Amino acid sequence: MESTPFNRQQWTSLSLRVTAKELSLVNKNKSSAIVEIFSKYQKAAEEANMEKRRSNTENLPQHFRRGNLTVLKKKWENPAPGVESLPESTRNSSAEVRHRGDPPPAEVASSSASGVEADQGVCPRPRFSSPPEVPYPNPRIKDTEHLKDHSAESKKMENCLAESRHEVGKPETSENAEASNKIEKYNVPLNRLKMMFERGEPAQTKILRAQSRSTGGRKISENSYSLDDLEIGPGQLSSSAFNTEKSESRRNLEFPRLSDTSIKDRMAKYQAAVSKQSSSTNYTNELKANGGEIKTHKLEQKENVPPGPEVCISHQDGEKVSASENSLAACSTPPEDDSCKSQVKSDVQQPVHPKPLSPVARASSLSESSPPKAVKKFQAPARETCVECQKTVYPMERLLANQQVFHISCFRCSYCNNKLSLGTYASLHGRIYCKPHFNQLFKSKGNYDEGFGHRPHKDLWASKLENEETLERPAQLPNAAEIPQSPGVEDAPIAKVGVLTASMEAKASSQLEKEDKPAETKKLRIAWPPPTELSSSGSALEEGIKVSKPKWPPEDEVSKPEAPEDVDLDLKKLRRSSSLKERSRPFTVAASFRTASVKSPKPLSPPMRKGWSLSEQSEEFGGGVAAERKQMEKASASEKNGSVGKTTWPSKESRGGEAAGRSKEVQDFEIGSENLIENGASLDEGDRDLLQQQSPLEPKSKNWSSFADNTSAKEFTTQKQKSQDVEFWEGEVVEELSVEEQIKRNRYYDEEEDEE
């Protein structure tokens, strides 16, 4: 009993042999009856297996034969009968592929381990066949020539051999592994291998480019190598048929191998082929002839094949690939390699019209060509940009409002920047607003011309020249009558230059603010009701500095109707009676009363003065006179006492110590002062001057009430004259003095205050 290497196919017989050996080793001294029984059983089992295998392979059709070596030997030795049975063998091989499932994916991983055998590729085997024994020399020579001309086929055989080696381990077939060892020792001469790879590799890459371009990465079909073997020789028919079967069976696993060559290499070879395309015209006729042969053989193969889209597509693939390989077969010498490449390229570039196919094949080809059109239609819409951010708008975030395209996130109120929707927006002049701000700024107040700087209605009402004039007027300095005032100021008569300049400054500043912040200033301008403080005509400097002052004078004093003629008579009397020194002194000092009240207003308010009695006011007057008695000759003393006398004129009636003529003059002066109020002079300025004087006087005279009885009627009357002079000046000079003169007098007053 000879010991042979363990093979998975012969597990039954080998297990019997091992058992017999073990028994013989263990029972050396005992009888060998058990060993003989086992050996007989083993031989009987081997014979039964061999007979069963022979009967199966001989009775079954060719595509179900599981690799009997004797059948293969006969095919190699007698190649002539194989020529006749070529169409039948190709049909059966393709049918077997469809009956059989796809091979396991593990077969791809081991395909790289069989590189030497794939390159030699001498004996291609059907599926499940064991390695054959050494072939005869004549087929070997033919096969090496075949490989040298078709290296693409050798690469396919590499994968097929790897697959068949994995399938060998199945228990349906039986053969020893000696033949596989011999195949591994078999060598093709190195120079032939070198020539084969140098010539065939570019052709392989060109074929791969042709397939990937024409069919979009479809798998290699069953026809790709069986049809072009017609031109080779009778010895190669069976090998090509078996190779066709295996390439078709691995159609779903072949696509990763198509991309082994890098894109850069393929691009370089493609450019080289295009540059030499001019020499390809000689082979176009050959291509047509080969196409005719392909057509006939393909129709023969289609006889027993049920139509299916994948099969039809594979027929087209086989047609294109085989046409390119037939052109390679025509080029047998190395100098013609470049022309072969260029012809392959021309074959790829020519539109390959499918040969007469079944309707299913036509439908599949039409369905293949339709998707690119759909892609073009999808790219047809124009690129849209958002009105606000000027970026691309995609359909998911597109919002069409006011005939403009927005992002959903960019559709916001241009005033408050709140996010809006199609139901909560309003538009004016192409701008988007939320409805509350639109109503506030435009609709409810009729402010379409002012809001946000839009002035469509004013353009209709007034000409452009008038608009330009209104813009240029703040830069000029016209007279009081020519200046258009704001609606709140127009109602009152404008008599003072100070009020004029202040209103001009306010107007200019409001226009500057309007340019920077149009919305806010407009909201301020439309305030209602208009302010009425200006109708009482406050002083110019107080308006410029915008000091908040209490409401003064009281309404009962202002509302007394008086005649302006009495004022003129009284002023003439005062001007005659006063000396030149007394008349010129107020011009130097009196204007400073206003700035004093602006610079340091004291917390004493006029309503507190209303609560005082007449006796307290007279005592205050007496205390002020006693404190300043030594400084009566100075201008500051005359000012202060005069103003005190002016505002405390009601005390003269309660005391009753004055002459009747003097009291009449004081009453006339009262009338004149109230009329001056109506004409634009301010009575509350004098009251502020009084408050300014009282506050420095209080710390000087804490016992000011004790001096009230010491005052004489003569001093009181002289002070009344001076107070009348001061009041006369206040009513007269408002129209004569300019702002610059008032500033000069303010400086002079500050120096006098320091002297005190």
Curated annotation (Swiss-Prot):
The record's Pfam families line, in alphabetical order, gives: LIM
- Alphabetized InterPro entries for the sequence: EPLIN_Lim_dom, Znf_LIM
Q: According to the UniProt entry, which residues carry N6-succinyllysine?
A: 435
Which GO BP annotation is one of this protein's?
cholesterol homeostasis
Ranges annotated as biased composition (Basic and acidic residues): 44-56, 140-173, 245-254, 294-303, 512-523, 552-563, 627-637, 652-667
What UniProt notes about the protein's domains is: Contains at least 2 actin-binding domains, one on each side of the LIM domain. Both domains bind actin monomers and filaments. The C-terminal domain binds filaments more efficiently than the N-terminus.
Q: Which parts of the sequence are annotated with region: Required for interaction with MYO5B?
A: 489-509
From the Swiss-Prot or TrEMBL record, what is one GO molecular function term? actin filament binding
Keywords carried by this UniProt record: Acetylation, Cell junction, Cell membrane, Cell projection, Cholesterol metabolism, Cytoplasm, Cytoskeleton, LIM domain, Lipid metabolism, Membrane, Metal-binding, Phosphoprotein, Steroid metabolism, Sterol metabolism, Ubl conjugation, Zinc
The answer, when asked if Transcription is one of the entry's keywords, is: no
Tell me which residues bear Phosphoserine: 15, 55, 130, 221, 226, 238, 259, 339, 346, 358, 365, 370, 486, 597, 600, 605, 613, 695, 723, 738
Please give the function described in this protein's UniProt entry.
Actin-binding protein involved in actin cytoskeleton regulation and dynamics. Increases the number and size of actin stress fibers and inhibits membrane ruffling. Inhibits actin filament depolymerization. Bundles actin filaments, delays filament nucleation and reduces formation of branched filaments. Acts as a negative regulator of primary cilium formation. Plays a role in cholesterol homeostasis. Influences plasma cholesterol levels through regulation of intestinal cholesterol absorption.
Q: Corresponding gene?
A: LIMA1
Residue numbers of Phosphotyrosine PTMs: 225
Region named Disordered: 44-183, 204-377, 508-726
* Compositional bias annotation for Polar residues: 274-287, 638-651, 691-721
Assembly and interactions?
Interacts with NPC1L1; bridges NPC1L1 with MYO5B. Interacts with MYO5B; bridges MYO5B with NPC1L1. Interacts with PXN; this complex stabilizes actin dynamics. Interacts with F-actin and G-actin. Interacts with LUZP1 (via C-terminus); both proteins restrict ciliation and may work together to regulate this process. Binds RAB40B (GTP-bound); interaction influences LIMA1 subcellular localization in lamellipodia during cell migration.
In terms of PROSITE patterns, this protein maps to: LIM_DOMAIN_1, LIM_DOMAIN_2
N-acetylmethionine, modified sites: 1
Q: Which GO terms describe its cellular component?
A: actin cytoskeleton; actin filament; brush border membrane; cleavage furrow; cytoplasm; focal adhesion; plasma membrane; ruffle
In which tissues or organs does this protein occur? Widely expressed. Highest levels of isoform 2 are expressed in lung, spleen and small intestine. Isoform 2 is expressed at higher levels than isoform 1 in most tissues except liver, fat and kidney. Isoform 1 and isoform 2 are expressed at low levels in skeletal muscle, heart, stomach and lymph.
Q: How is it modified after translation?
A: Phosphorylation of the C-terminal region by MAPK1/MAPK3 reduces its association with F-actin and contributes to actin filament reorganization and enhances cell motility.
Write down what this protein is called: LIM domain and actin-binding protein 1
Q: In what ranges is there compositional bias, type Low complexity? A: 107-118, 533-542
> Residue numbers of motif Required for interaction with NPC1L1?
164-166
